[in-house]
Amino acid sequence: MQGKMSFIIRGGLMEYLVNSREMKLCDFNTINKLGMPSMVLMERAALAVVEELEGLDLGKVLVVCGKGNNGGDGFAIGRLLHLKGIQVEILFIDEEEGCSQETKEQIKIARNYGVKILDQVEFNKYTIIDALLGIGLSRKVRGKYAEIIDEINKTSAYILAVDIPSGISADDGKVLGTAVRAHKTVTFAFKKIGLVLYPGAEYAGELVVKDIGINHLGFEKSPKTYSHTPEDLKLVPKRRPYSNKGSYGKVLVIAGSLDMAGAAYLSAKASYRMGVGLVYIYTVEENREILQTLIPEAVLTGYNRVDLDEGTLIGRIKDARVIVIGPGMGISKATRKILELVLREADVPLIIDA
C-alpha cells in the first residue's frame, strides 16, 4: 500500500499520522530498499504541487527555496511552472555548496531551462510557493530565514506551502520562532502530526495529501498516532427502530467525590457519545443535584461516604456490562472499599483510572 494509508483498528479505519522521524524512515526505505530514486520522488512531489495549482489565477509566481530537499522540491516546481508558460522566479539566499545533492541537481536543471533564480525580491508582486524549510526543522527559525518568513506573511499574496509551512514543527505543530501562514499546504504520502495539531493546523490552511509513491515500509505494526477518517462513520451501526436504550449496553460510572462532580459528568458524557444506551452513575450523595442537572438522562445512585450500602452497589455491578471506576474519586477509605468491592464482584470489563 502506498501514499495515504489507513489501518484496521478493532474493526475501524484509522488514518496514520507521522512525525518527522517516521516520515524520513519511509523516505529512506522507499529509496534504499525499494529502489525508487530520490530524484523521481522529488519530481513526483513537484508534479503534485503543480497539479494542485491548476485552475488558479497565479499571475507571477515566486518559489521560495531553502537548501534542503524541500527546497529541491521548490526548484522542480519552479521549472515545471516555467515550462507551462507561467512567469516564475525562484528566491534562493543560500550557498549552493551547502545544498543536498538532490537540490544541487534541481538547481542545475532549473538554470538549464532558463528559470530566474534571484537572491532578493519584492514579495508583494507574487503568488508564493513556500519551499524554504521542511519537516526536519527542530529548532527556532532565526536570521535571514526568519526575515523571509516575516516578509511572506506581510503580503496579501496567495501562499501554498510545500509539505509543511516553514517554521512549523512536524512533530507537534508548534511554531518554532516564526512560521509561514499558508492558505493551502500540499503534504506528501501521509499527514504529519504537526499539520493536525494546533497551531500548526491553523498555519497550514487547507490540507491536501498527495500520493507520490512513498511506501509505508518501516512503520510499526501498531500505529503510534492516528486519526479517524470519514469512512469510520460508516461503520457505526444504525439503531433498530424496535430497540430500546438497554439494547446498546449498560455502563456503570463510579466516579467523583465531594466537590469533584466534573469527573463523573465527563465520564458519563463520554460513554453516551460512544453510543452507550444506558449509563449508571455511582457517586457521593453530595453530587446528586449538579449531576442530575447536567446529565439528567443518566441513572444516578448516591452513596453515603461514612455508611456505604454494599448491597446497592453490588446490584449496580451485576447489571452493568462495562464498569468505569476512579475518575475524581480521591483516596478516601470509601474509595478503597468501593474499589475492593468492584474487583471482587465484577465479571465484566473494567476501566480503572489511577
Where are these regions (language model features)?
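Short gly/ser/thr-rich secondary-structure transition/capping motifs
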Residues: N112-L118, R142, S166-A170, D232-P237, ...
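Generic beta-sheet signal
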Residues: L91, Q120, A161-I164, F188-A189, ...
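Internal gly/pro-rich beta-alpha loop/helix module
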Residues: K125-T127, L132-S222
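A short, aliphatic-rich alpha-helical micro-motif
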Residues: E122-Y126, A179, I317-K318, L343
